[in-house]
From Swiss-Prot:
Record-given protein name: Ribosome-recycling factor
UniProt keywords, alphabetically: Cytoplasm, Protein biosynthesis
Gene Ontology biological-process entries: cytoplasmic translational termination
Upper classification of the organism: Bacteria, Pseudomonadati, Campylobacterota, Epsilonproteobacteria, Campylobacterales
Gene that specifies this protein: frr
InterPro entries found in the cross-reference section: Ribosome_recyc_fac, Ribosome_recyc_fac_dom, RRF_sf
Length: 185
C-alpha cells in the first residue's frame, strides 16, 4: 500500500518537473527557439490549427525564425496570427515565406526573463508540495482505517518528505541551468 503511495508521489512530482521544463521552452534565451511559436493558432479553412501544422518553422540563425507555409494563400493569415500573439516581433512577409527577426536581448530583458523562470519554478515547487500534502493525507487515511500502524505512518511521512526534498532540489537545479542559459550572452 505504502509503496503504491510512494510510486504515485514520484510519478506526479516527475510530471511537475516535466511541466516546468515545458514551460521553460516558452522563454526566450540568447538564441531564438521555435518553441516560442507553440500555442499560436492559425485559421486554416475555418479550423484553428497549430502554426507548426500549416508550414515548416525553422530557426535559421540565432536571431531569425522562418515560416514556410505549405500553401502560399495562408501567408496573410499566419502573419495576422503572429501579430495577435504578442511575442514581441513583427512578421516580415516577402510573398513566399515569413521571417521573424528577434533583436538581441538586453541585460534587462535577460534579467526579467530569469525572474519569470524563477516564478515558474516557484509554481512548480508549490505543485510538488501540494502533491506531498495529498500523499500525506492518503497515509493518514490508511492510519485511520487501521491499514497501517502509527510507526509505519511516521516512516511513510518521512519517506514522502525525502521524495519531496529531492524533487524540490531537482526544480532548483533545473532553474539554475535555465538561468545560466538565459543570462549567458
Amino acid at each position: 500500500m505504502l509503496q503504491e503511495v510512494y510510486a504515485q508521489t514520484k510519478e506526479h512530482m516527475e510530471k511537475s518537473i516535466e511541466a516546468l521544463k515545458k514551460d521553460y521552452k516558452s522563454l526566450r534565451t540568447g538564441k531564438v527557439n521555435t518553441n516560442i511559436l507553440d500555442g499560436i493558432k492559425v485559421d486554416y479553412y475555418g479550423t484553428m490549427t497549430d502554426l507548426s501544422q500549416v508550414g515548416s518553422v525553422l530557426a535559421t540563425d540565432a536571431t531569425t525564425i522562418t515560416i514556410n507555409p505549405w500553401e502560399k494563400n495562408l501567408l496573410g493569415t499566419i502573419e495576422k496570427a503572429i501579430q495577435n500573439a504578442n511575442i514581441g516581433v513583427n512578421p516580415n512577409n516577402d510573398g513566399q515565406i515569413i521571417k521573424l527577426f528577434f533583436p538581441p536581448m538586453t541585460v534587462e530583458q535577460r534579467q526579467e526573463t530569469a525572474k519569470h523562470a524563477k516564478t515558474m519554478t516557484d509554481n512548480a515547487k508549490v505543485a510538488i508540495r501540494n502533491i506531498r500534502q495529498n500523499s500525506n493525507n492518503k497515509v493518514k487515511t490508511l492510519l485511520k482505517d487501521k491499514a497501517i500502524t502509527e510507526d509505519e505512518s511516521k516512516k511513510a511521512q518521512d519517506e514522502i518528505q525525502k521524495i519531496t526534498d529531492s524533487y524540490v532540489l531537482k526544480a532548483d537545479e533545473t532553474l539554475k541551468a535555465k538561468e545560466k542559459e538565459i543570462l549567458t550572452v
